[in-house]
């Protein structure tokens, strides 16, 4: 019996992931009581039947206030911190005696270390000039995803409204530069990319 409940819950989770919508924490920001982003004028007076936020919740910003401080809650950047052990695959060792000035130059792999071991006589001098690159390791540039432009459905005059003469916000021949239904969300989850 418990396996049936688990299968039911997992199936519900997969269905929600497949057919749900991402409206962000504050809805689609178009205001008004007919802010049905989920249905957006597919019928029923052309205003949408989803209610505010497209979920019938009624009101904007229906979540905890602390979520505004979380970068991942509105599609912002995601900070990644990674640490690893020092590389051990490259070693430079010498037991020779050098007299005079010695210069060694080259590039070691990033995240490398340098060490000088040995005894220097009082008349000699030893030193290391070691730098660790420019700090650009791995991903060097991240930009916000811009919304998809020039592919949305526009304002359709009276196609799905209650009467042919009434303007309705629905599917139509118009193409908008802002996305679906003249004020689309573009691409991305949660953040408003207008």
Curated annotation (Swiss-Prot):
Residues 129-194 are annotated as: Right arm (Gly-rich tandem repeats). Pfam families: Chorion_1 (PF01723). GO terms for molecular function: structural constituent of egg chorion. This protein is one of many from the eggshell of the silk moth. Residues 1-20 form the signal peptide. This is Chorion class B protein ERB4. Residues 22-72 are annotated as: Left arm. One of its GO terms (biological process) is chorion-containing eggshell formation. Residues 73-128 are annotated as: Central domain. Transmembrane segments: none annotated. Belongs to the chorion protein family. GO terms for cellular component: egg chorion. Keywords: Repeat, Signal. It comes from the Eukaryota.
């Amino acid at each position: 019996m418990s396996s049936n409940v688990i299968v039911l819950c997992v199936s519900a989770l997969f269905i929600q992931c497949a057919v749900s919508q991402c409206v962000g924490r504050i809805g689609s920001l178009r205001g008004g009581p007919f802010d049905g982003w989920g249905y957006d004028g597919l019928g029923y007076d052309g205003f949408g039947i989803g209610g505010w936020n497209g979920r019938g919740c009624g009101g904007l910003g229906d979540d905890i206030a602390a979520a505004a401080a979380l970068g991942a809650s509105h599609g912002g950047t995601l900070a990644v911190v990674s640490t690893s052990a020092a590389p051990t695959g490259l070693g430079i060792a010498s037991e020779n005696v050098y007299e005079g000035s010695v210069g060694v130059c080259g590039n070691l792999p990033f995240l490398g270390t340098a060490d000088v071991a040995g005894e220097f006589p009082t008349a000699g001098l030893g030193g290391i000039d070691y730098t660790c690159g420019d700090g650009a390791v791995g991903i060097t540039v991240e930009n916000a995803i811009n919304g998809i432009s020039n592919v949305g459905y526009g304002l359709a005059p009276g196609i799905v409204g209650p009467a042919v003469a009434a303007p309705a916000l629905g599917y139509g021949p118009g193409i908008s530069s802002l996305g679906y239904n003249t004020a689309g969300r573009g691409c991305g989850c949660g953040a408003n990319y207008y």
